[in-house]
Amino acid sequence: MKFIDEAKIEVAAGKGGNGATSFRREKFVPRGGPDGGDGGKGGSVWAEADENTNTLVEYRFVKRYQAKNGEKGHGSDRYGAGADDIVLKMPVGTLIRDLDTGENVADLTYHGQRVCLAKGGKGGLGNIHFKSSVNRAPKQSTPGEEGEARSLQLELKVLADVGLLGMPNAGKSTLITAVSAARPKIANYPFTTLHPNLGVVRIDENHSFVMADIPGLIEGAAEGAGLGHRFLKHLSRTGLLLHVVDLAPFDETVNPAEEALAIINELRKYDEELYGKPRWLVLNKLDMLDEEEARARTAAFLEAVGWDYPKPDDRFQFDMETPRLFQISALTHQGTQELVHQINQYLIEKKRIEAEKAEAERAATNVEIAEQQPKTDTGVFKPE
């Protein structure tokens, strides 16, 4: 299925049915009272996050979604039927924005999450509601309310634990193939990857994580060059970035250090928050170099990019904040198991820290609420 990560649609809820003006007509009851029922409510339009949907492609072809109107009220106290709602299934990770106001309507982050995009109009009131002591035969009823209508921008950001970052042809697709069941298109030319690919990396029965391979970046990507910033957004929800560098480019004029610095510069220009995400360095294609040349190129690269963190041969107890360096061959799988093992350990620790932080915040909130509650008299006698 073709991956589509942006779409524009229009949604319109149904109008409420009109209330009825009607009077009882029975034998031997010449002056029957009002019996006009209310109109039914108009159908609403909802968005629902669905983990089995992974693209916005259908919203490129069908751009308008109109819910039905509510049924009008009837005599004999019969209310009009409400119209059915429309539910639009969207991928988890879809951001929905109102095109007219710029408001973020919804951020679909988990399976089954539902958000109302356009609310159906209320049904009108029948004349049964307007009977009074001075007006025994009211002819008044009200029309149904109009339903809401919106023009919306849908934007899909893939949800992944780890994002692969790098220039075209750095070997990102080969890496995700080596460590997961994902099978992206791979060839020896830039921009092989034309849309994000997701792969599930399984460590054991109880541990796995999701890795995202986005199209390669080039200098100027933050301004839209190449495949542009439309793919940088997919990295914003990841918890860890792997900066993959081709240490043995076929083109001898290519400088890996300059390319790596260009990528870092693009991140900084695009989004400071994205630039500040934990980012590990992965030097790829060691299978193309002998041991001595690999050592020399690695040393030259690290000096050129100003790497002042632990080197490959250092014995160092990594913490959560320290960037890490890996030397691998995605093609031969050299070093990939150590890489995914450390990623898994990092993500486990990250989730533990986040859970502890959330629990502490909940406890602090509960204390604050308790302190704001009025103190009640316990009924205990206290002598003056």
UniProtKB/Swiss-Prot annotation:
Domain OBG-type G: 160-348
GO terms classed as biological process: ribosome biogenesis
Compartment annotation: Cytoplasm
Biased composition range(s): Gly residues: 33-43
Domain named Obg: residues: 1-159
Cofactor: Mg(2+)
Gene3D superfamilies cross-referenced by the UniProt entry: GTP1/OBG domain, P-loop containing nucleotide triphosphate hydrolases
A GO CC term assigned to this protein in UniProt: cytoplasm
Documented EC number(s): 3.6.5.-
InterPro entries to which the protein is assigned, alphabetical: G_OBG (IPR031167), GTP-bd (IPR006073), GTP-bd_Obg/CgtA (IPR014100), GTP1-OBG_CS (IPR006074), GTP1_OBG_dom (IPR006169), GTP1_OBG_dom_sf (IPR036726), OBG_GTPase (IPR045086), P-loop_NTPase (IPR027417)
SUPFAM superfamilies linked: Obg GTP-binding protein N-terminal domain (SSF82051), P-loop containing nucleoside triphosphate hydrolases (SSF52540)
Subunit structure: Monomer.
Function: An essential GTPase which binds GTP, GDP and possibly (p)ppGpp with moderate affinity, with high nucleotide exchange rates and a fairly low GTP hydrolysis rate. Plays a role in control of the cell cycle, stress response, ribosome biogenesis and in those bacteria that undergo differentiation, in morphogenesis control.
HAMAP family linked to this entry: GTPase_Obg
Protein name: GTPase Obg
